[in-house]
Amino acid sequence: MTIGIIPVAIATAIGLRKEDMQTVLNLCTVYSDTLARNQLRDGYYLMHIKPQQLGISIPDGLKNLEQAISWPAKAVDALADRSQFDGFTCTDEEISKELHTIVRENALKRRYRKAVKGQLRNSCAFLTVTAGDVTVGEPAVIISAYSAVSAAALWDERLHRIQAGIVVVDRDNRPKHRNAPTWINVFTDTDIIRIRRPLDSTRWVAEYIPHGMGRCLMEPLVYEATLDRPFGKSRITRAVMDLTDDAMRSSVRAEVAAEFMTAPQKYLVGADPDALNKLSKWDAYIGSIFAVSKDADGDTPTFGQLQQGSMQPHIDYMRSLAARFSAETNVPISELGIVSDNPSSAEAIYAAKEPLVIDAQNLNADNGEALRDVALMALAVKRNVSFAEILATEPNITAKWRNPAMPSIVSQADSMLKIVQAVPWIANSDILLEELGFTDDQVQRLEGDRDRASAQELLKARFAAKATKTPVDNQDLLDGVIDAGKQG
């Protein structure tokens, strides 16, 4: 459980400038107001939430029976798994190398996978860019990711970006302190304000770290933002939570019904009640032999058995809930544990996944713009220039993504072959390798292998030409390869 913060205590921190107090107070208030709802959604994602029982069909002795439904996690992970960031591309080779280094030093691909799950859980996540201390082994630029449980921001509608933001950097992890925040960073257009609270103290102390970026070094990853909701919405919507509660209650009802259906209900007509009262309800329920005597009139009690109940209504209702959940989240119903008696065709499987693929394409487009701004901020911090100066160079930076449709290698190779036959010059482009599913690192290795193979072929041609005194093609290139080998 994550404890919140006290807005007034932080807004009156020692050393905090008067002109920044209202901004800090607003940020802390937003964080506190949204924390409970974000923790609730995290609870559904982690399957820690128990639904409210209706008190109709569940006996009191079984109302605490726990059932976990992973549908909210599936709603998040099914989309997150199709959003695979694969670095940046840039027409400027020097900038491309810088960005590759930044991505590698910050493990940004792995960090993005974590951030996108937080984004889909809570509607948004945040990336921050700060300068690292290279003297202690840190990278020149540090890119950090925070979920909405640890961060909040104020939106500037006119500039279409964050006006100011707050992140919880560190917490008190000692027992009985409930993860209380001890270090908070506030990001503004001119400064990073470190506000810390020493352990066992109630006073906060502010420290200013000015930067010359001219903008807040914090960027949101937002899912389905609208004009009214600039920070988007969660994949775990109210409908998802309600359906999950209903599914858990249905699962409990099915569990209870299954226990009663293991032995059909029996009855005795005309038996002495005192004889039956000697048996407990459980013994009467599971007992296979009844011993009863005739009544005073000499009549023998009539034994009977009720028709055994069916689990089909429970199965049908769970299938109905899964269909509604699938419609709400675009997750194929087959991924929710509902198996069809008739196998689906390849076309039907693709059609079921198409809405989720479209969601992933939209998600990648939105996150691609955010990651581009993060890349520009990282370059500005690394070069110690303003954000405007980096923009003035007009670097053509774009985020690169794996295909969210996740086609098979065979089908993708077949489609790319047809494209190359129609447009032959594409065969010389790296895009062909990317579309075939090769990662950025694999593309670089393939290009290195190709260059070495070309050099070896040129050397063989040179030696063959000397033996036969025949001129060789690409003599200038060959001389360059030989010179490079001598220098190496």
At which residue positions do the language-model features occur?
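Extended, regular secondary-structure scaffolds
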Residues: 113, 120-121, 126-234
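Extended, helix-rich architectural segments
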Residues: 1-145, 462, 478-488
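Short linear loop/turn motifs
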Residues: 338-345, 438, 442-456
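Extended, charged amphipathic alpha-helical segments
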Residues: 204-351, 400, 404
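Charge-rich, acidic-biased intrinsically disordered regions
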Residues: 13, 21, 135, 139-143, ...
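Membrane-proximal bilayer-interacting regions
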Residues: 406, 415-422, 426-446
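C-terminal amphipathic alpha-helical
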Residues: 109-123, 127-128, 254-259, 310-409
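Extended, compositionally biased alpha-helical segments that mediate assembly or anchoring
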Residues: 447-488
